Amino acid sequence: MTETFQFKLLAADGNARRGEVVTPRGTIRTPAFMPVGTVGTVKAMYLDQVRDLGADIILGNTYHLMLRPGAERVARLGGLHKFIRWERPILTDSGGFQVMSLSSLRKLNEQGVTFKSHVDGALYHMSPERSIEIQGLLGSDIQMQLDECVALPAEPDEIERAMEMSLRWAERCKVAFGDQPGKAMFGIVQGGDIPRLRERSALALRDLDLKGYAVGGLAVGEPQEVMLGMLDVTCPVLPADKPRYLMGVGTPDDILKSVAHGIDMFDCVMPTRSGRHGLAFTRYGRINLRNARHAEDTRPLDEQSSCPATRDYSRAYLHHLIRSNESLGGMLLSWNNLAYYQELMAGIRKAIEEGRYTDFMAETMEGWQRGDLPPV
C-alpha cells in the first residue's frame, strides 16, 4: 500500500485532463464526482450502494460533524472511515462555507470565526488551526483550508478583503497540517467574479506548494459563463501536476463544461437533493417524476442503465411514490441520479483517453436537448 499522496496525469485532450489521485486508501480516477456525505451519510443511500456505483471518494462536512456527533467522539470511535464503514478516501471541507452562511449567528475576525450552533445555540470558535485539527480527528484523506466565501454579488473591496484573509488562513492551515504522509491539504482559490483577484489568489496559493488546489466561491448563483470565465483565469495559473477541485459543482452540464476548462474533481448535493424532490437525471436530460404524464408510463427511466433503480422500476411507480411522499421514491431517484453522475464521469474519462472529448460533449448535450421519449 502506498504511503504517499500523488497526482498522475495520464492523458489530456485540450484542457480536459484524465488522471489519478493516488492515496493509501485507494486511487481516485479523475475527473471524479464525489458524493456528499454531509453528516457521515450520503442521504437516502447505503454506502455499499455508493461504492458499487463506482465512487472512489466521498465528502464529509466538518461543520456538521463537529456539532454532531463531535470530532473528538468520532476519533475515539476509530475515525470517520471506521465510523461510517467507508474504506476508500474521504475529503472533508473546512466548515467555512456553512459557518459563513450563518450571517446572523457568527462573528468574523483575523483569528477565525465565532458562531452559534444551529443545533442547540452553543458558542463555537473555529480558527484555521482548529479546522485542521477537527479534520485530523475525523481522519480524512484530503483536508481543506478554512476560507471566507463571500456571497455574490458583493462589492469588490469586500471580495478582495475576504480573498486576502483566506490567503493568510491558507498559510496558517499549512503550518497546522504539517507533514502527514499519504494525506493532503488543499488551498482554496477565492476572488469572487473579479479576474485579477482570482489570478492573485491562485498565484499566492501556488507559491505555498500545496498538494492540491480547489476553486471556491463559484456556482453560488452567478451565470454559468461567469463561472467558466473564472476557471479560464484560474486553471492556467495552477500547477499542472496537482489536482484541481471545483467546489459545490454541480449540474451535469456544469461538470461537462468545467472538465473542458481543466477541472479534475467535483462535489455537489444535487443528485441526492434532486432525487428527494422527484427529479431524475438521465442521458435524456432531467425528468420530473411528479408530472402527471408519468402516471401510466410503464417504461423505466433508462432500460440500458446498469442501475436497478433506473432499469427495473416503471416511471408510473416512481411517480406514485413521489406523489405519495413515500421515502422509497427519494431513495430510488437518488440511486438513479448518483448512478448517472458516475456513468457520466466514466464516459468523460474514456473520451479524454480516446482524444474525443469535444465530440463526447456534443453527443451528451445533444441527448439532453433531444429530451425524454414521448409519453406512452
Swiss-Prot record:
The keyword Glycosyltransferase applies. GO terms for molecular function: tRNA-guanosine(34) queuine transglycosylase activity. Pfam families: TGT (PF01702). Residues 248-254, 272-276 are annotated as: RNA binding. InterPro entries: ArchSynthase1/Queuine_TRR, TGT, TGT-like_sf, tRNA_ribo_trans-like. Keywords: Glycosyltransferase, Queuosine biosynthesis, Transferase, tRNA processing. Substrate binds at D93, S94, G95, G96, F97, D147, Q190, G217. It comes from the Bacteria. The active site is at D93 (proton acceptor), D267 (nucleophile). Its EC number is 2.4.2.29. One of its GO terms (biological process) is queuosine biosynthetic process. The keyword tRNA processing applies. It catalyses: 7-aminomethyl-7-carbaguanine + guanosine(34) in tRNA = 7-aminomethyl-7-carbaguanosine(34) in tRNA + guanine. One of its GO terms (cellular component) is cytosol. Pathway: tRNA modification; tRNA-queuosine biosynthesis. SUPFAM superfamilies: tRNA-guanine transglycosylase (SSF51713). Catalyzes the base-exchange of a guanine (G) residue with the queuine precursor 7-aminomethyl-7-deazaguanine (PreQ1) at position 34 (anticodon wobble position) in tRNAs with GU(N) anticodons (tRNA-Asp, -Asn, -His and -Tyr). Catalysis occurs through a double-displacement mechanism. The nucleophile active site attacks the C1' of nucleotide 34 to detach the guanine base from the RNA, forming a covalent enzyme-RNA intermediate. The proton acceptor active site deprotonates the incoming PreQ1, allowing a nucleophilic attack on the C1' of the ribose to form the product. Belongs to the queuine tRNA-ribosyltransferase family. PANTHER family: QUEUINE TRNA-RIBOSYLTRANSFERASE. Homodimer. Within each dimer, one monomer is responsible for RNA recognition and catalysis, while the other monomer binds to the replacement base PreQ1. This is Queuine tRNA-ribosyltransferase. It comes from Rhizobium meliloti (strain 1021). The gene is tgt.
